[in-house]
Amino acid sequence: MKLQLCLVLLLLGVLYVQSVPEKRNKPECNSYRGQCTYMGHPCPDHTFPCETYFDCPAGPHERCCCYKD
């Protein structure tokens, strides 16, 4: 039982460590001439959805649409 608890805590620790630096290193959408649109709405012309690459400062229910240069 103790071993299982140790393994679970270790796994949670590893997942936490992996998730923190990734979030910190992502630039905000605005710094890439991006704009936020509500999830489910298409991105405007000349933009592409980039929710997997950029953090959207507007909140968790939104995604980024970044301009194509």
Curated annotation (Swiss-Prot):
The keyword Disulfide bond applies. GO terms for molecular function: toxin activity. Disulfide bonds: none annotated. The keyword Secreted applies. GO terms for cellular component: extracellular region; nematocyst. Residues 20-22 form a propeptide. Residues 1-19 form the signal peptide. Contains 4 disulfide bonds. Induces neurotoxic symptoms on zebrafish. Has also been claimed to be implied in calcification, but this function seems improbable. Belongs to the Cnidaria small cysteine-rich protein (SCRiP) family. delta subfamily. This protein indicates that the SCRiP family is also present in Actiniaria (sea anemones) and not only in Scleractinia (stony corals). This family has firstly been claimed to be implied in calcification, however, as this family is also present in sea anemones and that they are not calcified, this function seems improbable. This is Small cysteine-rich protein. It comes from Metridium senile.
